[in-house]
Structures are given as structure tokens and as C-alpha cells.
């Protein structure tokens, strides 16, 4: 762990340098490939890990090798993972989905911004130096139209986004021919419907049923389509965002790019400091993944941080502002009802959700029902006009394992199920947020309750943390719970970093959180039996058994750390071709011994086989040619 502490000025300068020198970068011995769809502009990016050949015999002077197939893997890095793409953060990413959005002819450009706050910010010349220069002219659904992926799916339409996703979810496994790599254990999927091959029609049907969502605001055309659902790969979200005391626009853009490099499927901008609007614009215009927000945070800023002063009008203006910038999903704490707040009084840790506590305080101050609940249909009308998905927030989630699975938590969950049905009336896509802090033996109930109460809408959880005793290691305590609930059916896992409960994460913390959660998500995919999930594991195991060290590094989720740990003990280049590692040494390496045993067994089998044939030959009289009936 680094002990170097940078000043705020140094941190900003470092982030600015990162942005200024940013270019498409591939992982070691990987290359970007594109798998095309039925139309020319559906080009699905993947990373292909190139592997070295296996030594199968021959002599020292004339060795014989067998080629190993390249392994394609899911890639969230967008253009940042393609060395052939010129990156310019000042201009933003190419608008990948714009032709698809325009071709549907159900949306129109706005003459002016719908949000009074946005108009005010745009009129402020003092913000020119902070503002993203290539502002997008926002679009909205035409009168009487709905532009959501759920609406299209219910009409039986397979959109380009759906075809893109089908190709992406199959992870290029059709390219793999090796039976060794294709071998996979059957999973235990707890009632999930995992097909052998994911088709565009399957994607459409899952979205139409509400079991999956495609977060894809029509004002975020830069995003690459992805899906969140129980019957697809488990996804991982990363949180970034500035605060009133730390972090800048440059640092948040850097964290965005960094997050997508290390596997974030979506990113939530939880900014609460100054320049929230400007920071979000920079993030959206440079994000290849969906962006989520918690609009109540910004609405609170607009009333100077006083929860009691929040109004529906201020919140509505914030929704319009963010929808027209391109936010793909909103976390809305509409299930924190006035009558549920007293249920938290006897909790050890009360209400730990920031959004939940804001709404609880507002309800108690005014002794009125949550205005997000009261105006929920209006929220849905806004979302359906831009295709903003709803992430129904768990404002009453447990903040300690003592409070897990209590009355307040599940009462709110049942209300979220009722709100899900309302959102679906407006063709608005919905996922449900979950805990939190839950011991291992109580995790599965969270999944079963959610499936039943919320009609199989996708579940999105923060961990859960399985113990409360490990500040500084909560990425690990929560990774355990994340792997379990992902196996049980959770669709997306919100990462936890080592700084959880302690401070705002920096770049290294973001990486640590993401790697931990990519492990959890992948472990869940293996346990569920997602088609093709085991290919990379098989390739790694084969490389490990054959002492192909470079391939082991390159197949790892974090090749750089794997290489660094190996080189701490065996830094010489010869260590990367050695048939042992530093753990056991050359004489006690189990895999080297296993290879020797295998070779010996094969030789013995040949020798025994020859002896058997010799005995049989003598038993037949030693004649070279036998009569037909004796043969």
C-alpha cells in the first residue's frame, strides 16, 4: 500500500495529465476485436487474449508445439480499450447509438432545456472554463410516444441494442473449438432461465417480461448497450463522485475511464460537491457505460442541504436536468414511507442510506407522505420520455448485521414491488436495490423475497457485507456476500472499496473494489452455469499446468499484479519459463510431479500393452498369419 500523500493541487495535476495523455490501451498480449451483427453498424467490442503454444514433444533443438486458441472476454472499456481509436476527452466519445435512435423516428430535439436550473447554468459565463464544450442538443419522445427499450420489447421489436447485447453476452465463445476449453460444470441456477445460446429474441423477451433492463437514455448515445438481468452475466457497478471537501472534475473523469478499464459495467455518479452539473456532463460525454445517479443528492444541494426545504418542484426540475443530460438510471427512494420510519427506531444503526435518511427527515418534519411516492406516476412519465430506467432505492436497508432482514427492510421491499407495477404501466424499466449488511445464512431470503415481492425485476445489491468487524477490508467482507447473492439470482453488484466507511476512494481503491467484485460476479456466473463462463478458467488451468507463465499473467483479471507478485521472487526472465514456482521450488512442485506421473503412467500403459500383445501373439502360436476363424 502506497504511503505517498499528494496535495490537492498535485492530485488535480496528475488527473489532468492522465486525461491529456489518454489513448486507447490494450491489456498485455490482448487485442481488440469486433464481432459484427446483422447490420454493418452493430460492432460489438471484445478483448481477445493471445496465448502462447504448448510444448508437446520433440527435442531441445527441434521442439514441437501445439497452438492454443485465443480467449475472447467481455470488455467494458469502450474506445479506451482500442489502441486504434484516437481519444479526445474534450470532444467526448463517438455517438454509437445515434443512428439507431434517429431511425426510430419517435423522438425530437428540444428547442430549449426543460430544466430551469440547466438554463441558469448555461447562462452563467463564469462557468465557461468548466463546461464541456461539445454540448449535446437533448431529445425527448414525441407527443404520444414512448422511447423505452421495454416499450419496444413489448411491441415485439428487436432493437439494434438487443442484438448488440446478445452478441456481447455470448462472449465470443463460438470462436472456441477446444473441447478442453469448452468443458463446463452444470450450474445450480435457483430457477433462473439460462439458455444454451443467447439470441436477440431472448433478450427482447426478458426485457418485455421485466426480468431484465437495458439502461440506455436516448441522450446518452455514446454508451455501448448492456443488460442487467438474472438470466445474463452478473454485472458490477462502480461509484464515483466528488464531494464538498475533495475531488475535482478531472479526477472524476479519470476515475470513470479507470473504472471502465477494470470492468465496471455501469458507473454511478454520486457527486455532492460543487459543479455537480458540469462534472456529470463531462462524465456522460466520455462514458461508454450507462451512468446512474441519485437525484435527491443534487436536489438537496439546490436547497442548501436542508432536507426540510426539499420540494417536488425542485426534485422534478432535477430529474429533467439529468434526463436531458443523458443519465441512464435514477435511484429513487420512493419506498421510504412515513409509517415505516418508526420501525427503524429500535435498530442498532438506524437509517444508513443517505437518500433514505433525507426522505425520512422530510417526512417527519412535515408529517407528510414521501413526495417521491406521492408523485411516482409523474416520475414515470418523465422517465418514459427519455428512457431513463428506475433503480428503486432501498432507503431502509440494514446498516449492520444486527439489523438485517427486519420489518422495516422488507416492508419497504414490498412497497417497491407495488411501485414496479406502476412503472411498468408507463413502459419504464425497473430494477430493485438491496442490502447492505447481512450475515451469510440470511442472504438467500433477500433474493427470494425480492423475486416474489418485485415480480422478478432485476435485483441490484451493495454487497451485502457479511460481517462488520473489518474496516479497511470491506471489499472482502462484502465480496463474500456479493458472490453468494449473485449465485442466488442478483443481477448487478455495487462494488465496495477498501475505503468503505472510512473515506472517499482514490484510483487504487476503485481498482481494488472492481477486481474484488469482478471475482464475485464471475464466481456467481460459474455457479449459475452461465454458458461459456468457464472458458477463461479452463484456459488459465491449462496454462498453469503447462507452466506457461506469461499466459497465466495475461489471463488474470489483473495481469500487472499477477506478474509483479511472481517477479518479486523470480525476477529473472528464466523464471517465466521455469517448470516450477517459488512456492514449492523445482523439486516439490505438485504440477511438475503430476506431469511426471502422467508421463510415467502413459509409458507404463504402452509397456503393459506391448507385453499383453506379445503374450497374445505367443498364445496364437507365433504365426504371422492366422486363419480367419482364429483371428
Curated annotation (Swiss-Prot):
EC annotation from Swiss-Prot or TrEMBL: 4.1.99.17
Listed cofactors: [4Fe-4S] cluster
Gene Ontology MF term list: 4 iron, 4 sulfur cluster binding; carbon-carbon lyase activity; zinc ion binding
Binding site for [4Fe-4S] cluster: 581, 584, 589
Keyword field: 4Fe-4S, Iron, Iron-sulfur, Lyase, Metal-binding, S-adenosyl-L-methionine, Thiamine biosynthesis, Zinc
Pfam families: ThiC-associated, ThiC_Rad_SAM
Cofactor comment: Binds 1 [4Fe-4S] cluster per subunit. The cluster is coordinated with 3 cysteines and an exchangeable S-adenosyl-L-methionine.
EC supergroup of this enzyme: lyase
One Gene Ontology cellular component annotation held by this UniProt entry: cytosol
Job description of the protein: Catalyzes the synthesis of the hydroxymethylpyrimidine phosphate (HMP-P) moiety of thiamine from aminoimidazole ribotide (AIR) in a radical S-adenosyl-L-methionine (SAM)-dependent reaction.
Oligomeric form and interacting partners: Homodimer.
NCBIfam families: PRK09284.1 (NF006763), PRK13352.1 (NF009895), thiC (TIGR00190)
Protein name listed in UniProt: Phosphomethylpyrimidine synthase
Natural source organism: Salmonella typhi
Gene behind this protein: thiC
Amino acid at each position: 500500500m502506497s504511503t505517498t500523500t499528494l496535495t490537492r493541487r498535485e492530485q488535480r495535476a496528475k488527473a489532468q495529465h492522465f486525461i491529456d495523455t489518454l489513448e486507447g490501451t490494450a491489456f498485455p498480449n490482448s487485442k481488440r476485436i469486433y464481432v459484427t451483427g446483422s447490420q454493418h453498424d452493430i460492432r460489438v467490442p471484445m478483448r481477445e487474449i493471445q496465448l502462447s503454444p504448448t510444448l508437446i514433444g520433440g527435442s531441445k533443438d527441434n521442439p514441437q508445439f501445439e497452438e492454443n486458441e485465443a480467449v475472447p472476454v467481455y470488455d467494458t472499456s469502450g474506445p479506451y480499450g482500442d489502441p486504434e481509436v484516437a481519444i479526445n476527452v474534450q470532444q467526448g466519445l463517438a455517438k454509437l447509438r445515434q443512428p439507431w435512435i434517429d431511425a426510430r423516428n419517435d423522438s425530437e430535439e428540444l428547442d430549449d432545456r426543460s430544466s430551469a436550473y440547466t438554463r441558469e447554468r448555461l447562462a452563467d459565463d463564469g462557468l465557461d472554463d468548466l463546461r464541456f464544450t461539445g454540448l449535446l442538443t437533448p431529445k425527448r419522445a414525441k407527443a404520444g410516444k414512448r422511447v423505452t427499450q421495454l416499450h419496444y420489447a413489448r411491441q415485439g421489436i428487436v432493437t439494434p441494442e438487443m442484438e448488440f447485447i446478445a452478441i456481447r453476452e455470448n462472449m465470443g465463445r463460438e470462436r472456441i473449438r477446444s473441447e478442453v476449453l469448452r468443458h463446463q460444470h452444470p450450474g445450480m441456477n435457483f430457477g433462473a432461465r439460462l439458455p444454451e445460446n443467447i439470441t436477440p429474441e431472448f433478450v427482447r423477451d426478458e426485457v418485455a417480461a421485466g426480468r431484465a433492463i437495458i439502461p440506455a437514455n436516448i441522450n446518452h448515445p455514446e454508451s455501448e448497450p448492456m443488460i442487467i438481468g438474472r438470466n445474463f452475466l452478473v454485472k458490477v457497478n462502480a461509484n464515483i463522485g466528488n464531494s464538498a471537501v475533495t475531488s475535482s472534475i478531472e479526477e472524476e473523469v479519470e476515475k470513470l475511464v479507470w473504472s471502465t478499464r477494470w470492468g465496471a459495467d455501469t458507473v454511478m455518479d454520486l457527486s455532492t460537491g460543487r459543479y455537480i452539473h458540469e462534472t456529470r456532463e463531462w462524465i456522460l460525454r466520455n462514458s461508454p457505460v450507462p451512468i446512474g445517479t441519485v437525484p435527491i443528492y443534487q436536489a438537496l444541494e439546490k436547497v442548501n442541504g436542508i432536507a426540510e426545504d426539499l420540494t417536488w418542484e425542485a426534485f422534478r426540475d432535477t430529474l429533467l436536468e439529468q434526463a436531458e443530460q443523458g443519465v441512464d438510471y435514477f435511484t429513487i427512494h420512493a419506498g421510504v414511507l412515513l409509517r415505516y420510519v418508526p420501525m427503524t427506531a429500535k435498530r442498532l444503526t438506524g437509517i444508513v442510506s443517505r437518500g433514505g435518511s433525507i426522505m425520512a427527515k422530510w417526512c417527519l418534519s412535515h408529517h407528510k407522505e414521501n413526495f417521491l411516492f406521492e408523485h411516482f406516476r409523474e416520475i414515470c412519465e418523465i422517465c418514459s420520455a427519455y428512457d431513463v430506467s428506475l433503480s428503486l432505492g432501498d432507503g431502509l436497508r440494514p446498516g449492520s448485521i444486527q439489523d438485517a432482514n427486519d420489518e422495516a427492510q422488507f416492508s419497504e421491499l414490498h412497497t417497491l414491488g407495488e411501485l414496479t407495477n406502476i412503472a411498468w404501466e408507463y413502459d419504464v424499466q425497473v430494477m430493485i436495490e438491496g442490502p447492505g449488511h447481512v450475515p451469510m445464512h440470511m442472504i438467500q431470503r433477500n433474493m427470494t423475497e425480492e423475486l416474489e415481492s418485485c415480480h422478478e425485476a432485476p435485483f441490484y445489491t451493495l454487497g451485502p457485507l457479511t460481517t462488520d468487524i473489518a474496516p479497511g477490508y470491506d471489499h472482502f467482507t462484502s465480496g463474500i456476500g456479493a458472490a453468494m447473492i449473485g449465485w442466488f439470482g442478483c443481477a448487478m453488484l455495487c462494488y465496495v472499496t477498501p475505503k468503505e466507511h472510512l473515506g472517499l476512494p482514490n484510483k487504487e481503491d476503485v481498482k481494488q473494489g472492481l477486481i474484488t467484485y469482478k471475482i464475485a460476479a464471475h464466481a456467481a456466473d460459474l455457479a449459475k452455469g452461465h454458458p461459456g463462463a468457464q472458458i477463461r478458467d479452463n484456459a488459465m488451468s491449462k496454462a498453469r499446468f503447462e507452466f506457461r507463465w506469461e499466459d497465466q499473467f495475461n489471463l488474470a483479471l489483473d495481469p500487472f499484479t499477477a506478474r509483479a507478485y511472481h517477479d518479486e521472487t523470480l525476477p529473472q526472465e528464466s523464471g517465466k519459463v521455469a517448470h516450477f514456482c517459488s512456492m514449492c521450488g523445482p523439486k516439490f512442485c505438485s504440477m511438475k510431479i503430476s506431469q511426471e506421473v502422467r508421463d510415467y503412467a502413459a509409458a507404463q500403459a504402452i509397456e503393459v500393452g506391448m507385453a499383453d500383445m506379445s503374450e497374445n501373439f505367443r498364445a496364437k502360436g507365433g504365426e504371422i498369419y492366422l486363419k480367419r476363424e482364429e483371428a
